[in-house]
Amino acid sequence: MERKLPFKWEHDEFREAFGAFLDKEAVPYYDEWCKNHMVPHEYFEKMGQAGFMALWVDKKYGGAGRNGDFLYTVIKAEEYSKRGLNCIFSRLSGDVVAPYIAENGTEEQREKWLPRIVKGETVLGVCMTEPDHGSDLANIQASAVDMGDHFLVNGTKTFISNGM
């Protein structure tokens, strides 16, 4: 059974623009990035300058304000996949981790971090996989102790996605 998503002309324009961006800013460098196991920070900044980071973020924080329209995220995933760009985790920063700040952060934290994420200045990562527990967050062994003005984090990780 074929399923069709309800794309509109705005989505088609976005797809064309994002695909052209990838062809210029990612495809020519992708093999080198994979070899080095790192996507350079400049790529995220270019994504931000082009308006492709964290599209859901409210306009008051510098975002496009496309909250609730998940089809833009679908298009980004399809365009990355279409080009075989499987080790670029830009969606992790803007679409997976940043919503935690938007939903659970204070207004001060939103004002500080969301504009930087939208611009690609700040890249968020995830480090949850541990040697003896995999990605089972219920059994995570890492600890974080509130030291007053900072947290002391102690633990061993196997992977850090978007670690730079």
PLM segments and residue spans:
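N-terminal glycine-rich anion-binding loops that anchor highly charged ligand groups
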Residues: 16-21, 45-50
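Intrinsic disorder at enzyme termini
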Residues: 1-13
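Glycine-rich, Trp-frequent "lid" loop and neighboring beta-strands that shape
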Residues: 62-66, 108-164
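N-terminal capping segment at the start of a domain
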Residues: 22-31
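His/Cys-centered metal/cofactor-coordination and adjacent catalytic loops
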Residues: 39-40
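Internal helix-loop-helix
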Residues: 49-111, 115-120, 161-163
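Active-site-proximal, well-structured secondary-structure segments within enzyme catalytic domains
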Residues: 35
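Residue-level signal for inorganic ion chemistry
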Residues: 11, 22, 106, 155
